[in-house]
Amino acid sequence: LPGVLGFKPSVLLLTTGYALGYGMMGLSGAELLLSVSFFLVGIAKGSAMNACTILVSGNSADRTRGMNLMHSCYACGALLCPFLIAAAARVSTELAVFLLAAMGLVLWLVYVFTPLHGGKSKSSTEKEAIDWSFLWSARFWLLTGLLFFQNAAEQSVNGWMVTYFKGSGIIAGTLAAYTVTVMWGATLVGRLLIAFVFPFKKPRKAMVGMSVLCTVFYVLLVMAHTQGAAIALLFAFAISMSGLNPTAVASAGRMTSVTSMGIMLPVASSGAILMPWTIGMVAERAGLAAGMASNIVPCVGLSLIHISEPT
């Protein structure tokens, strides 16, 4: 799309999905309309992530620090926004949804008044020539595979851990609902530490270490039988994985473009769709404990990817 409309017009067009999607959710509960609304919100989210990735990558002297700082902002929003929306929902569900629509409109206005450039030498409206050379890069596909497994492992824990903890009785009551808060809190802490306190001098070795640690902590997590151990291991798992996504994207280096990110991020995000679905299928046949155990596969995949990655 940027090759036809230009970078900024493309971003402005696609990010309207936040305001439109959430606005439609607040106005109607019709199933078809809700499906369209969620689709628009998903398009807007993908566009915003792609745009921010391109902008940060193209304007950062240290890509790894820049990407971790950007993803820290993402984690901060994911940590705090649910509390704001929950407070609004106490008044009415419609108010909560319209508040999300208003936030989407604010984001769109930020893009309107911000000079957007698809790179250091590209104007915001310039129609970019598409370079497909990254498709023949083994490093590009290995990084995409790494992100695929990271998304699969992380979103499976986000989506299923509350159900698993409640069903197994490991964490009872309202505390189980705050496990996602623990994850996002750990993620925020980890990314800020990488950005400002412990910057990576050798990103590849750092990613290997993070991959191994998140695998170890996940194995221990599914073996936990007490509330304290489960919370501590969940925090450790999340903080060990926190820097993988931004560091992997930053490692794309010169391959970072509107087109390459438009392929890398959606392909990687499919892991967040397939693995939670797989856990559900396994859980139906063998129980939720077996389903959660199957999430060890993408965790191990993170480590195996590095064996094939060129140095």
Annotated model-derived regions:
Residues L1-G26:
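Conserved MFS/SLC helix-loop-helix module at the cytosolic interface between two early adjacent transmembrane helices
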Residues F38-S72:
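Cytoplasmic helix-loop-helix junction between adjacent transmembrane helices
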Residues S303-T311:
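Residue-level detector of conserved catalytic or cofactor/ligand-binding positions
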Residues R204-A248:
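C-terminal transmembrane helical hairpin of 12-TM major facilitator-type secondary transporters
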Residues A138-T181:
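Extracytoplasmic gate region of multi-pass secondary transporters
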Residues G6, L27-L32, A61, A224-H225:
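Helix-breaking motifs and short loop linkers at transmembrane-helix boundaries and internal kinks
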Residues L1-G6, G190-K202, A283:
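Helix-to-loop junctions at the C-terminal end of transmembrane segments
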Residues L69-L116:
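Helix-loop-helix hairpin linking two adjacent transmembrane segments in secondary transporters
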